[in-house]
Each structure stands twice: as C-alpha cells, then as structure tokens.
C-alpha cells in the first residue's frame, strides 16, 4: 500500500530536521570561533604550566642554549656559506682536450 500524499501544510522531518537546522546554525560558529577557543585554552594551559618552577627552569636553560647557538653561528659566518662552489678546473681542461 502506498503512503497517502503529503499536504502542503504537512510538516515532516521531526528530530532529524531539527538537528540538521541546529547543526547548520552551529557550523559557522564552530568554524570561526573554534580556533579562537582552542588558542585561548592552549594559552590558559600554558600560563598554568609556566607558573611551575620545575618547568620554568629547563625552559630557560633551553632558551639560553638556543640563543647562544644562534649567536655563535651568526658571528662565525663569513658569507661564503651562501655562495656556489667554484667550478672544477680539471673538468674544464678535459673539455678543452676534447675540442682539439
């Protein structure tokens, strides 16, 4: 037996339709506010962790070591590190011999 034809005023969808409407309404909120909420939660957790001296001391040591390494590497650089290697002279000589 076929179901009766639906009337123009007949509302179907029930719970599934309601959830779909709520989901569509929440999607832009989650999309735009989600990263902000995640970042604020991470910053709050980081702020709570940084109060602990057991984690603050090793972080300071690591930061000092990284800064020292960066400054030493920067100071000893003489500018040759970015230049291309010089062409090999032995290859040039072989090319000249082949042409003769």
UniProtKB/Swiss-Prot annotation:
Cell membrane is among the record's keywords: yes
GO CC annotations on file: plasma membrane
Keyword annotations of the record: Cell membrane, Membrane, Mercuric resistance, Mercury, Metal-binding, Transmembrane, Transmembrane helix, Transport
Gene Ontology BP term (one): response to mercury ion
Topology relative to the membrane: Multi-pass membrane protein
A single MF term (Gene Ontology): metal ion binding
Residue numbers binding Hg(2+): 31-32, 82-83
Transmembrane stretches, start-end: 19-39, 43-63
Localisation per UniProt entry: Cell membrane
Function: Involved in mercuric transport. Passes a mercury ion from the MerP protein to the mercuric reductase MerA.
Protein name: Mercuric transport protein
Organism listed in the record: Streptomyces lividans
